[in-house]
Amino acid sequence: ENCPMYNSIIEFIEKDTTKIEKFIKESLLSGNMMRFEEELLDTVLEFGRSLYQEILESIEQTIRNSEFRKQSYHVEHKEDRRTLLTRFGNIEVKRAYYAPKHGGKRIYLLDKYVGMDPNDKVSQAALAQALKEAVETSYRKGGEEACLTEDVVTKQTVKKLIHGLEMEMPEEIPQKK
C-alpha cells in the first residue's frame, strides 16, 4: 500500500523538478532572483495543495473501508465536494456523508476526525493568519494575508471572526490611594 502522499510526491519529482530547473535557467541564472522566488513559491504551494488534498482523500478512504464504519454507518452521499481555503490556497475536499445504521445524526466522518466543522470554508490555520494580520492592520489586509496565494478571506469573514471571539478580560486591579 502506498503512503497517503505517494502520488503527489511522484508527480512533484516527475513534473515539478523539471519546472524548477527551467526556472533556474530562465530566471535565476539570468539575474532575475525575484522572479525565480515567485515561481518557486508558486510551485511549492501547488505541491502543498496537492499533498494536503491527497492526504485528506486517503483519510476518507481509510474511514470508508474501516470495520467501524461498515458496522456503524452506511454511505449516504459518496462524494460531496467542498472548497477549503488553506494557507496553501484553495483545495477541493471530497468526502462521504454517512448515516448511522441504528438512527441518529448524519455526519461527515472525515470532518469529525480532522477537527473541521462541516460548514468551514476556511482552515483554522488560514483564519489564525488572517486574525493575526487583522489585529495589526485591517480586516481586508487580514483576509489577504490568510493564505500564501492570491486567494483571500473576505473582510466580512475576518470581522465576524474577531467579533465572535470571546475574550476573558482581566479583572480590574484596584488603584492604590
Model feature map: region roles:
Residues E1-K101:
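Short, conserved DNA-binding cores of transcription-related domains
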Residues D16-I24, I91-K177:
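Short, positively charged, Gly/Tyr-enriched micro-motifs
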